[in-house]
Amino acid sequence: MRAVVLALTLALVASQSVNFAPDFAASKTYVYKYEALLLGGLPEEGLARAGVKVISKVLISAVAENTYLLKLVNPEIFEYSGVWPKDPFVPAAKLTSALAAQFSIPIKFEYAKGVVGKVLAPTAVSETVLNVHRGILNILQLNIKKTQNVYELQEAGAQGVCKTHYVIREDAKAERIHLTKSKDLNNCQQRIMKDFGLAYTEKCVECRQRGEALMGAATYNYLMKPADNGALILEATVTELHQFTPFNEMSGAAQMEAKQMLTFVEIKKDPIIVPDNNYVHRGSIRYEFATEILQMPIQLLKISNARAQAVKILNHLVTYNTAPVHEDAPLKFLQFIQLLRMASSETINAIWAEFKAKPAYRHWILDAVPSIGSSVAVRFIKEKFLAGDITIFEAAQALVAAVHMVAADLETVKLVESLAFNHKIQTHPVLRELTMLGYGTMVSKYCVEHPNCPAELVKPIHELAVQAVANSKFEELSMVLKALGNAGHPASIKPITKLLPVFGTAAAALPLRVQADAVLALRNIAKREPRMVQEVAVQLFMDKALHPELRMLACIVLFETKPPMGLVITLASILKTEKNMQVASFTYSHMMSLTRSTAPDFASVAAACNVAVKMLSNKFRRLSCHFSQAIHLDAYSNPLRIGAAASAFYINDAATLFPRTVVAKARTYFAGAAADVLEVGVRTEGIQEALLKLPPAPENADRITKMRRVIKALSDWRSLATSKPLASIYVKFFGQEIAFANIDKSIIDQALQLANSPSAHALGRNALKALLAGATFQYVKPLLAAEVRRIFPTAVGLPMELSYYTAAVAKAYVNVRATLTPALPETFHAAQLLKTNIELHAEVRPSIVMHTFAVMGVNTAFIQAAIMARAKVRTIVPAKFAAQLDIANGNFKFEAFPVSPPEHIAAAHIETFAVARNVEDVPAERITPLIPAQGVARSTQQSRDKLTSMIADSAASFAGSLSRSSEILYSDLPSNFKPIIKAIVVHLEETICVERLGVKACFEFTSESAAFIRNTLFYNMIGKHSVLISVKPSASEPAIERLEFEVQVGPKAAEKIIKVITMNEEEEAPEGKTVLLKLKKILLPDLKNGTRASSSSSSSSSSSSRSSSSRSRSRKSESSSSSSSSSSRISKRDGPDQPYNPNDRKFKKNHKDSQSTSNVISRSKSSASSFHAIYKQDKFLGNKLAPMVIILFRLVRADHKIEGYQVTAYLNKATSRLQIIMAALDENDNWKLCADGVLLSKHKVTAKIAWGAECKDYNTFITAETGLVGPSPAVRLRLSWDKLPKVPKAVWRYVRIVSEFIPGYIPYYLADLVPMQKDKNNEKQIQFTVVATSERTLDVILKTPKMTLYKLGVNLPCSLPFESMTDLSPFDDNIVNKIHYLFSEVNAVKCSMVRDTLTTFNNKKYKINMPLSCYQVLAQDCTTELKFMVLLKKDHASEQNHINVKISDIDVDLYTEDHGVIVKVNEMEISNDNLPYKDPSGSIKIDRKGKGVSLYAPSHGLQEVYFDKYSWKIKVVDWMKGQTCGLCGKADGENRQEYRTPSGRLTKSSVSFAHSWVLPSDSCRDASECLMKLESVKLEKQVIVDDRESKCYSVEPVLRCLPGCLPVRTTPITIGFHCLPVDSNLNRSEGLSSIYEKSVDLMEKAEAHVACRCSEQCM
């Protein structure tokens, strides 16, 4: 038994000692046959592909222990561009010969236990050739485990370290080892790959979970024979597949297939001869990038003399782009860039030195240099600017382009840094900003490539920030923060947070806009470190003491970090107790909009927001749009993997009309990546105030002293910061800020000063002289708009590239000449141009050519083989015109002259093809369309006959199938007939031509696609497509000499009439109806007034078949329903089970039907008849009146035939009637359009529009009128008609086509948004009614013949000026002042008091117990400007109100006496006879209004102060919101934070709040007669606080009588107290003054005095 166990053990050990790793014995040469193939295209056969094949013998021999030689013998290179698999490979003999020397050199490599180590080769072997050797070595790379047959690992190979699966099977009988390994190239620890142009994109992980755009995998199959020291590879087969599709893979994909075969031939004893070349270490098996990084895949250039070739192309670009842009200009520009990339710095400098003095050449070089894409470009720009060779504008343009096009490496980053901190750059503010932003961008791009980039890269910016803070250079600090935001380095979080209020003390001295920039600078950092930024953003958001704008910006940053569910729920919890309405509205709207997000990367956030919104109250949804809002809209298509998102942030701080900040951002999703394409932010702090208020009031010592004396009496007064007029704007592309501008008063003043300077006037005069002499301008702009590349190795060792290029060249040619009559003197004023006849003749020829390429394939410096999509777009739109302007005579004339048009004014061609070419034989490149021509038209006459016979047998069914779909089932047809039907389906061609006005315009569209293979978007794009647009003179009509458009205004309009209009006084019906209408008049004389429906839109439409009794019942019903419309509206709106019926709401007119606008017109029974009376009295106003304006549009033809249109307008002021007649100029054409409008009253206007032959074919009536719906004011617009033209069938066809592209959920969404109900309304009438249910809400009702649509409670952004629309009397003398007043009135906020109830600006009501004889601040400007102040006191004797207004240089007192309101201005009484009163500036007006008096001063911020015996009200303008204080509040919309005392403290007691705004006295002998003061009071009882007896003092001042006075009337007040131990000492003077800053320990009641009586001894 022991012997058996020993034998088994020895057998097991022996079996484990077998070495499966390949081994090559010493002193032997192993000969293999090697074949490698790389082929790209679509997976279907019969289509074109492009590829490369390499065939060779491979010799492997050992030269030392673990060191081997590998040599290729007789290598051959083949190209492929043809129809697969029919066409053969073509030998690239010249390329093989050129590379033969390199291939003949053997390479060395280390190899042990199946693992390839170092690779050594002479320097004479190029990296591309060495990579081909690495492709062979990659086959030998085998990590074989002795104890496992199935396993996986991350294996190093030519393509990186990727996940590899091994399966080993031993065939002991055949003595063979079968090994299979497979690689997942999408699962790599280190994938060798180079990306260009993708630094600004973000990986959308969630998008890629649904499918990768680029997928790759490889399988390796080995057949090996065991040997003593290892295994011998007998055969190795490699198959690798890369698949790319921008859409979902189910739509189809392009693929690149690599195959390798290594077959053992023999073993030779002759060793490989080692050459004398010096072998150097050239890396490992990992692929090394060569010159393919600089090589564009769209063309292959053989560079022999870079400078000479570049100069040749430069000459071509200049020579062939003097007229319209040459169609190959973009391609030549790309060739020029390619040559500059390959050239040395010395060569580029030599080209510049040769052509820098030639403007035509200079700009081509400067536009091409940034596209070099390396540090060479930045160094060139730096050197030339510092040397003074390029201007500031040229440097700025080149720097912006270079920063975004140059690849970021450490050298480039350091170059941009040195440029940003260069002294010469620092002296130019624009260049400094651009370079600082660019430096941040370069750091960001570098960190994308190197995630562990050092913090030292942003250290210089951090130091600059510290210096800016220390020196209080806020503008510089803002720029530095934007640079840090561009860099997005995590090391910047600490320096940024030091500038924020929560984290650093430096923030206290910083302006709000700088703090806002600091918050926004965190956004790009959040993309790399979302968790760290979330911690900062949450703390900012939670700090309720921060300015609301900072908290809302923190909310933006927080949601961009894609917070988890827990954090979103935390925000919702905070929102429940949020008192700031701006923050609450913004956060809730942000969450609400994100709940509808369909973007994959925001799916988790959308789910979290759904939960959070449900936790919150619906009251947030009802907030006005005056509050801050966030809007997010997106759409994402899973099949196409394309999406777009738009976000808009509206940040306000005081519910004003103009927001404080507006940010709009667009984001796109494509092929598993996302990018913030564009973002624009505008800050309007102070702009509205600067536009609407008067210039700053002069520092009048008396005025300022008076106001400051008043506010000094307030307890612990703190003024608000003055809003400095400032506007700022920034623009971001792909998440990087490229430019920003701050505009303040100093900049505006400088611009105005520059505009009025003598140099500016001289510049204007010189420009005018140049125009008079004739000037020609030419501008050419080439641009490499896009270069996106991804390069990675294949198993063969050749690189595969996916790339996208767009290059364009635009040119504008302008020739302009001006003529002035009479000629101006040498020195003239601009006003003289208004009295001059100006003629301008111009010729323009703009042209653009754009080339776009999408490439997939092999790209090296030696050979290219790829499939390519190429799009060419070219537009040329020449024009020649003349314009004449005679302002003095009211004439404007424009003439367009014919030009020789190009063959096509716009052309677009798209084609896809396979191309193969090599550098040794570039002219012999082989191009094959992806869909071969023979594949499209493959048929024979015999097959056509058979097909015809088969179709004839089943014509009906076949035709039905063809009409239903473009996809045809071929199951019933033989396979040889399928291509014929496919060819019929694939080809599409359409031409549409329109001839009008002597011009023939044609649109041509042709398409041949691969949709016959699979009807998806991807296959529809494959093939050839073209769109052509041409505009040419019509051959069937006489030539057009010119087109004229002329406008004549004023008394000379009649002189321009070409066609005299004559209209019959009796309106006749069109032919065929005249007899019938006359017969009706004879037989039924009462039909007109009885049963015929009125053609006027103002009358109700009633059917002629109704009886009088039914009409009477109808009227009774209408009357009853309208009387109860108010209550029914409320009940129906609130009742969930009762649907709203808009027909129940009847419109009651404001005007009387019998009212007329002219004494000449007799009263009639309806307003419609009054319109007809006016119309019939003078059917054509041209018989009595001269035209007010005439417009001529005509063609001047070679045969002198008049063609065109004439528009004349007549105005009859007596009847308020406007008539416009448009007529064809052709004397044989009686077509006209007649429009008559009459203002029947202040509440109604009616218009009739008729057209056709003599305006009799068709007509419509339009009526707009105001009235009431229930108690609410309303406006109604009605459109009625007798006959309308039919809509052409072609229009309906296009409508159906468009409707097919509308997503199915849209109608349902609109149905929920706008409810509708089917009604049988008037068949010839549309009625639109808007009801103002309140100043801020509307009900909208639309009635059409078949349905009624309505929307209730539509919120408005501003209040409706009901009172102001009827009374614009304050400034009747000036229309500008009227508009200004109305605009201010619309957005003003109101504070009022009726009896003892005060309603604040924020609409919060509270009862006020006013102290007698003491002034209280009702409302005042709380900034340091003190533009106005309104005081109120109650007289001690009569207890009547007395208002004092301090504004500008006047002091206004308003009080009542027995006979009415008394007005005093600066102590002088203004009698009623002297009202209205205006101050000397005219900006303040006092006038009677109703039973009281109103003061108006909107330009000072005070819209109105109204005062009568029983009430008063104050209105402040929109731009003062948030800047007021007093009893009326801040007017910031924050009704939860209404009770703010002068110190800024928020109190809960309305009484304490009201008393805090009392102006106390220091003595009872004070002239104000106020006998009270504010002081902290001691609680009358002792309390136990913290287990100690304590004495307590109020932390809020309480109104008390002065010493020596006794209270006559008191009121209870609940206030906070701060407690101290009983034994503690409190200095009465110092302690009580600081007690107001203490914390509240308890709330208790105290007594406040509101009336006092003093003794005579009181001082």
Curated annotation (Swiss-Prot):
Vitellogenin domain sequence ranges: 24-662
Organism of provenance: Oncorhynchus mykiss
Tissue and organ expression note: Produced by the liver, secreted into the blood and then sequestered by receptor mediated endocytosis into growing oocytes, where it is generally cleaved, giving rise to the respective yolk components lipovitellin-I, phosvitin, lipovitellin-II.
Domain of life where this protein originates: Eukaryota
GO BP: cellular response to estrogen stimulus; cellular response to heat; response to estradiol; response to insulin; response to polycyclic arene
Domain VWFD residue range list: 1389-1565
InterPro entries: Lipid_transp_b-sht_shell, Lipovitellin_superhlx_dom, Vitellinogen_b-sht_N, Vitellinogen_b-sht_shell, Vitellinogen_b-sht_shell_sf, Vitellinogen_open_b-sht, Vitellinogen_open_b-sht_sub1, Vitellogenin/Apolipophorin
Protein name (database record): Vitellogenin
Lineage: Eukaryota, Metazoa, Chordata, Craniata, Vertebrata
Pfam families: Vit_b-sht_shell, Vit_open_b-sht, Vitellogenin_N, VWD
The record's account of how the chain is modified after translation: Phosvitin, an egg yolk storage protein, is one of the most highly phosphorylated (10%) proteins in nature.
Induction: By steroids (estrogen).
